[in-house]
Amino acid sequence: MIPLQVDPNVVAQGVNYVWILVVSFLIFFMQPGFALLEAGQVRAKNVGNVLMKNMTDWALGVLVYFVVGAGVATIVGGLTSPGGFDVAAAFSYIGDSGAWIDWLFGAVFAMTAATIVSGAVAERMDFRAYVVFAATITGFIYPVVQGLTWSGGLLSGSGYLGAALGVGYLDFAGATVVHMCGGVAGLVGAKMVGPRKGRFGASGESQPIPGHSMLLAVLGTLILAFGWYGFNVGTQATVLATTESGGLEFMGAALGRVALVTTLGMGAGAVAAMVVSTNYQGKPDPLWMANGLLAGLVAVTGAVPHVTWWGGLVLGALGGAIVLPAYRWTVDSLKIDDVCGVFAVHGVAGAVGTALIPVFAVGGFSATQLVMQVAGVGIIALWTIVASAVVFAAAGTVFGLRVSEEEELEGLDIGEHGVSVYPEFIGESGPDRGVGTRAATDGGNDVRTDGGNDVRTDGGNDVRTDGGNDVRTDGGNDVRTDGGNDVRTDGDVVGDNGVAVTEGNDSAAVDGGENQ
């Protein structure tokens, strides 16, 4: 019997490409994580709009990135390096089946950058304007950043700046290329669209607008953390390598370092944020801990193979510790209503973590590398600010960036999409009632539970249990048990002064940290 002859290179390539496919699917699973995280941090009347934007980010984004984005990245890489470029070659992946796995891996990163923006502009941006920006960030803004870095452009070792300094920009899995790009773009969008109604008082003081579900926000955070292993560990794309003797070598040490630093950064960020929020508010806040966990991950995303394990722990802790101060600076000083705190979580943490890589590098400190890191962070941020401002301004000119005041008050679910994620809060459709019409709240009208028909249990009069105050059971009408103060079950609890608070903790917030 002739022994089976196997080419080690073929085996290694096959295993590595299967690995890339698997982690690409894992990174895709971050999309529902983003959807849940953002949905939990907005009010119930805007959840459908959040879900629509997140689905659009992916569905439209992959089409644009396939037709345009990936090619733009290659062209920018050639334009900003001595190598030059060929337009036809830049788009050759479209017809090359051998390049499609690599394209998919790049696409899931591009979609992440786009999705981050949604959380900053939630609850007031016109959907058409958002679609324009989503298409542009995946087709042009992010691909330019990719071209400057990962596609061999300006900041890479072979790019003009990298060659001049003798070192290339270090960002392993996209702390700045993906996350800071998305976070800065979100900040620009939030500034240009303006704050939500009621977000700031007459004298400019912060007025928290709590989201409707801490549960969804934390669940989304944990799903994102799970997908992040694909993001970071998956970027270590070589699982098997060939040796000089023709054998195969498992790259366990490299994979292990990335996995360990990712995990330590995640944990350190969460604990640091818990400590800071406790010091700031007097009690540990679950949402701030969730934000710190994500910020810790962002902070180490660019650093995971380059720093020591303890360096990763420190970077993660820094990322988590600065989330609350960065958010408060954004809201209190800049007066920007960043609903989900994406600039603090993705922008600031990504910039700090990537800039400090040389300080904790495995090979020791390098001043030249530090210069490159700081320059790279600045260049990426500057490009993102300018490009995003132009696109948002253009979209605003054509469509208007913001929905009407009436639509914002009613909720974007009804105004933009004609749906409600929680129909029991607002009544059902029926022959005499349009979809989304609120159930009556005028002290004697009908309680409806059957799509529009009247349900009465006392011969026609309203059910009363408190000597005259109305008790309603349709998930959105007023329940009165105290002689006058309204208790609502549609996400807001209203006290004597009409200010919405959260149950059990009137300073807690679930909208990215909007605490007094």
UniProtKB/Swiss-Prot annotation:
Primary localization: membrane
MF (Gene Ontology): ammonium channel activity
InterPro entries listed in its UniProt record: Ammonium/urea_transptr, NH4_transpt_AmtB-like_dom
Record Pfam families: Ammonium_transp
Transmembrane segments: 17-37, 59-79, 101-121, 130-150, 170-190, 214-234, 258-278, 286-306, 307-327, 342-362, 374-394
UniProt entry keywords in alphabetical sequence: Ammonia transport, Cell membrane, Membrane, Transmembrane, Transmembrane helix, Transport
Site (Twin-His motif. Important for optimum substrate conductance): 179, 346
Matches recorded under Gene3D superfamilies: Ammonium transporter AmtB like domains
Keyword Transport applies: yes
A cellular component annotation (GO) from this entry: plasma membrane
Any GO BP: ammonium homeostasis
Source organism, top-level taxon: Archaea
Annotated segments matching region Disordered: 426-516
Family per similarity comment: Belongs to the ammonia transporter channel (TC 1.A.11.2) family.
Function: Involved in the uptake of ammonium/ammonia (NH(4)(+)/NH(3)). Transport is electrogenic.
Subunit details: Homotrimer. Interacts with both GlnK1 and GlnK2 after ammonium shock. Interaction is rapid, reversible and dependent on nitrogen source.
Protein name as annotated: Ammonium transporter Amt1
Species annotation: Haloferax mediterranei (strain ATCC 33500 / DSM 1411 / JCM 8866 / NBRC 14739 / NCIMB 2177 / R-4) (Halobacterium mediterranei)
